[in-house]
């Protein structure tokens, strides 16, 4: 035999049946891993094609069985087991379809490669039919039977069975030497792997330490990043505050300038208001004197009205007496003309007195109205005086407040605010005194009253026709006597 072609070389799961003793037919069965190797070779003498089946175990070095199958032996095998494929197709069929994934295991830890990962003639067709391998050992371990079964959900059937003989002598020694060399290679590989593992463990420890350090550095970096973000936010806030402060300082400077102008104008207004207040006070005192005089005149008129009423009662009584007298003297023919003349005089006198009473009543009503108007004007003057007093007090408080703020120290951090106060809107007043005022030309003229609806000043003293007539009548009565009561000045 010259050359070999390995068609299949994989570790399979098989059921190993071993007799308990030489004399007992019972078997001990257990699952084990066996390595099946199928190779194709040529006979050196005849050149005939042959298939070599070889099984071994990694945990039992003496477990080595093999059998060479040529065309003649295969025909006997096919006839015994009713095989339908020829000798050339036999290895391909059993490799690709019978040795499926259910029994083929990938044992990369043993240095093998799964047949399903190989391409070509000896690759495994996936999925394949479920199969089972049984290996029956001889009691003396001189041969074994390699049986291949197909499985169904309810039964299993034998496909074929090959009798393998134990390998001994030089072939076994060669097999053991191969195992030793492979084990030596594995051992050296293990040593290298152990050294590499130790170095890797050391590196892993170093890496773990570095990872711990890096985790700490990462946490510090995250903390620093958060602090940096916070600082950036604070910087932005500081920038915004600085800009706001700058704008505020500019506004405050403008407000301070306006406040200076307002303070000066308020000072001037305060002085003018004080002068106006003095004038209004004098005016109120004058008006109060006039009211007192009117009240005195009203009392005198009331007394005169009482006298007139008494005279009216006397006249009525005289009229009644005259009526009685007329009734008494109605029968006297000679006295009729005289009585009629007296009666006419009495009636004329009564009409004159009635007209006088009516005129006095009208005069009293007019005087009462004028008195009420004067009272209202006096009340308005008092209200105006109180308002002016309150405005004067408010202006004094504002000026004191402005002076206090003006001479108080400015807040720290705002140097632009040390020159003045905050701007505030102040109510505007119409000037009363001065060259461009209604009373600027003549300060001795009548002081105006302040209107309730507007801030302009108007003279509220208006002479009515009745008051003018009454005053002229009073002046005439003082010199010539009363024309109404026909009494001299001394008797009034």
Curated annotation (Swiss-Prot):
GO terms for biological process: centriole assembly; centriole replication; centrosome duplication; protein localization; regulation of cell cycle. GO terms for cellular component: centriole; centrosome; cytoplasm. Residues 46-98 form the PISA domain. The keyword Coiled coil applies. Its main location: cytoplasm. Residues 192-407 form a coiled coil. It comes from the Eukaryota. Keywords: Cell cycle, Coiled coil, Cytoplasm, Cytoskeleton, Developmental protein. It is found in: Cytoplasm; Cytoplasm, Cytoskeleton, Microtubule organizing center, Centrosome, Centriole. InterPro entries: Sas-6_helical, SAS-6_N, SAS-6_N_sf. Disruption phenotype: RNAi-mediated knockdown results in failed centrosome duplication in embryos. GO terms for molecular function: identical protein binding; protein domain specific binding. Gene3D superfamilies: 6.10.140.2140, Spindle assembly abnormal protein 6, N-terminal domain. The coiled coil domain is necessary and sufficient for interaction with sas-5. The 35 nM long coiled-coil domain mediates homodimerization while the globular N-terminus links the dimers at an angle of 40 degrees to form the inner ring. Nine homodimers form a cartwheel structure with an internal diameter of 23 nM and radial spokes connecting to the microtubule triplets. Interacts with sas-5. Central scaffolding component of the centrioles ensuring their 9-fold symmetry. Required for centrosome biogenesis and duplication. This is Spindle assembly abnormal protein 6.
């Amino acid at each position: 035999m010259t050359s070999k072609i390995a068609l299949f070389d994989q570790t399979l799961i098989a059921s190993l049946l071993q007799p308990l003793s030489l004399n007992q037919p019972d078997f001990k069965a257990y699952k084990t891993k066996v390595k099946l190797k199928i190779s194709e070779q040529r006979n050196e003498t005849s050149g005939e094609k042959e298939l070599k089946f070889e099984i071994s175990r990694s945990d039992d070095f003496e477990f080595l069985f093999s059998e060479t199958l040529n065309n003649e032996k295969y025909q006997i095998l096919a006839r015994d087991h009713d095989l339908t494929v020829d000798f050339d197709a036999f290895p391909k069929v059993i490799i690709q379809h019978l040795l499926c994934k259910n029994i083929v295991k990938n044992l990369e830890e043993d240095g093998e490669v799964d047949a399903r990962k190989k391409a070509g003639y000896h690759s495994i067709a996936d999925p394949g039919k479920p199969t089972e391998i049984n290996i029956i050992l001889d009691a003396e371990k001189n041969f074994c039977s390699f049986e291949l079964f197909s499985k169904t959900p309810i039964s299993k059937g034998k496909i074929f069975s090959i009798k393998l003989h134990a390998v001994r002598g030089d072939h076994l020694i060669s097999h053991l030497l191969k195992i030793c060399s492979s084990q030596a290679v594995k051992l050296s590989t293990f040593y290298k792997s152990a050294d590499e593992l130790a170095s890797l463990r050391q590196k892993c420890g170093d890496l773990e330490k570095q990872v711990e350090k890096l985790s700490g550095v990462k946490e510090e970096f995250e903390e620093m990043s958060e602090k940096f973000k916070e600082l950036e936010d604070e910087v932005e806030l500081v920038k915004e505050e600085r800009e706001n402060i700058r704008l505020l300082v500019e506004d405050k400077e403008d407000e301070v300038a306006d406040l200076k102008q307002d303070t000066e104008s308020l000072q001037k207004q305060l002085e003018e208001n004080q002068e106006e207040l003095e004038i209004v006070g004098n005016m109120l005192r004058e008006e109060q004197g006039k009211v007192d005089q009117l009240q005195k005149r009203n009392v005198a008129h009331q007394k005169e009205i009482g006298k007139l009423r008494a005279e009216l009662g006397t006249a009525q009584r005289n009229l009644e007496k005259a009526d009685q007298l007329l009734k008494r003297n109605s029968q006297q023919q000679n006295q009729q003309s005289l009585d009629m003349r007296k009666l006419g005089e009495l009636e004329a006198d009564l009409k004159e007195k009635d007209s006088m009473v009516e005129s006095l009543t009208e005069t009293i009503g007019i005087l009462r109205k004028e008195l009420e108007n004067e009272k209202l004007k006096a009340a308005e003057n008092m209200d105006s005086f109180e308002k002016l007093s309150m405005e004067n007090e408010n202006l004094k408080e504002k000026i004191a407040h402005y002076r206090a703020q003006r001479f108080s120290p400015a807040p720290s951090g705002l140097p632009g605010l040390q020159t003045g106060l905050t701007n505030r809107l102040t109510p505007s007043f119409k000037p009363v005194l001065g060259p461009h005022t209604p009373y600027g030309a003549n300060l001795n003229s009548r002081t105006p009253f302040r209107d309730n609806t507007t801030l302009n000043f108007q003279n509220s003293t208006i002479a009515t026709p009745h008051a003018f007539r009454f005053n002229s009548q009073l002046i005439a009565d003082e010199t010539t006597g009363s024309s109404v009561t026909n009494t001299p000045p001394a008797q009034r």
